[in-house]
Amino acid sequence: MPIFKKTLIVLSFIFLISILIYLNMYLFGTSTVGIYGVILITYLVIKLGLSFLYEPFKGKPHDYKVAAVIPSYNEDAESLLETLKSVLAQTYPLSEIYIVDDGSSNTDAIQLIEEYVNREVDICRNVIVHRSLVNKGKRHAQAWAFERSDADVFLTVDSDTYIYPNALEELLKSFNDETVYAATGHLNARNRQTNLLTRLTDIRYDNAFGVERAAQSLTGNILVCSGPLSIYRREVIIPNLERYKNQTFLGLPVSIGDDRCLTNYAIDLGRTVYQSTARCDTDVPFQLKSYLKQQNRWNKSFFRESIISVKKILSNPIVALWTIFEVVMFMMLIVAIGNLLFNQAIQLDLIKLFAFLSIIFIVALCRNVHYMVKHPASFLLSPLYGILHLFVLQPLKLYSLCTIKNTEWGTRKKVTIFK
């Protein structure tokens, strides 16, 4: 990033965080809500501060035998074809590209892929297409490919994702460090322009990678290598394949949360990192109902895998601390909101109500300050995501925790997003 843009981001963050500190002290002081505000501000400063120090890996990647694995279920035909074309266009050679259809009821996509592979023989010599007779879930679809490949490195790609031509090459630069066992790229919404929800989702994605994963990467322990674009060393996948396919939680089989699970396997071996120069765009839900179902699935996966991460507190305290921070911030927010609503000692007049709303807006702007130089106009929508996060996504997260044993996590009937 040019020094001018980076300086602008840092100065803007300092300005916004200063206002946030003042408003929090004025509005809530040393109350429960005020204490939460202090902890939140501290956490923001730590995460944003680390993200400002982040630098991507450089150098020429070593020679690896790489296999791409693309599971698909009832995917849009053109979307899957675009995914395949983007993988074929990689600047780093792939030894194998597996497309595994997981028993789709709508076979248009896999038929289109088969026709394309048969027609474009010269460029598709290393493409292997497989149709499963029954729907077993994403993990089993991936495992079909893992079991048949002797690759040194596996590239995982979601079926609704476009990966940039140099994405794999950039990811593999991180593997020049032999202590790195998994890496993920930067994700944005391909359909960002569709409506307000997709714009807000893109803002959230940019923060999740450009801030959260950048900060975690600096410590060598990102918590999730995202499904749309990640690489894993063979040692991460193959020894854990049976565990991966047959994972259970509270006595029930686990079918999703694959990326978090694989990341935990990688953490057991070494470092997991983020490579900002490896980029991809993915389709995101544009209807609120589908979006909330997706978030519900992700929330349940977050809580399940967080339990596993916290257990690593002796072997890998940094991973446990990142996880504990996320869980504690969620729990404290619930307590703070309850205190705000039901504690009669806190009297909200119009001025304080305006200040409270201002805090929500400024927190959102602080979280997404990186987005300011990328899409300045859309950056101003960040407060809307703050409202969505506080009044919709946080209650949904609590609901997900309370219903974590319910395996009916919801999918889209026509097109399932595997995330």
Curated annotation (Swiss-Prot):
Chief location of this protein within or outside the cell: membrane
Co-factor(s): Mg(2+)
Involved pathway(s): Glycan biosynthesis; hyaluronan biosynthesis
Biological process (GO), any one: hyaluronan biosynthetic process
Membrane-spanning parts: 8-28, 33-53, 318-338, 345-365, 376-396
Keyword Heme among record annotations: no
Catalysed reactions, semicolon-separated: [hyaluronan](n) + UDP-N-acetyl-alpha-D-glucosamine = N-acetyl-beta-D-glucosaminyl-(1->4)-[hyaluronan](n) + UDP + H(+); N-acetyl-beta-D-glucosaminyl-(1->4)-[hyaluronan](n) + UDP-alpha-D-glucuronate = [hyaluronan](n+1) + UDP + H(+)
This protein's UniProt keywords: Capsule biogenesis/degradation, Cell membrane, Glycosyltransferase, Membrane, Transferase, Transmembrane, Transmembrane helix, Virulence
A Pfam short name: Glycos_transf_2
EC category name: transferase
Region forming the signal peptide: none
Membrane topology note: Multi-pass membrane protein
Record-linked CDD domains: CESA_like
EC numbers for this chain: 2.4.1.212
A GO-annotated cellular component: plasma membrane
UniProt-recorded Gene Ontology molecular function terms: hyaluronan synthase activity
Cell compartment(s), UniProt: Cell membrane
Family, similarity comment: Belongs to the NodC/HAS family.
Job description of the protein: Glycosaminoglycan synthesis. The hyaluronic acid capsule is involved in the pathogenicity of group A Streptococci; it may be the major virulence determinant.
PANTHER family attached to this UniProt entry: HYALURONAN SYNTHASE, MANNURONAN SYNTHASE
Protein name in UniProt: Hyaluronan synthase
Organism field: Streptococcus pyogenes
Gene that produces this protein: hasA
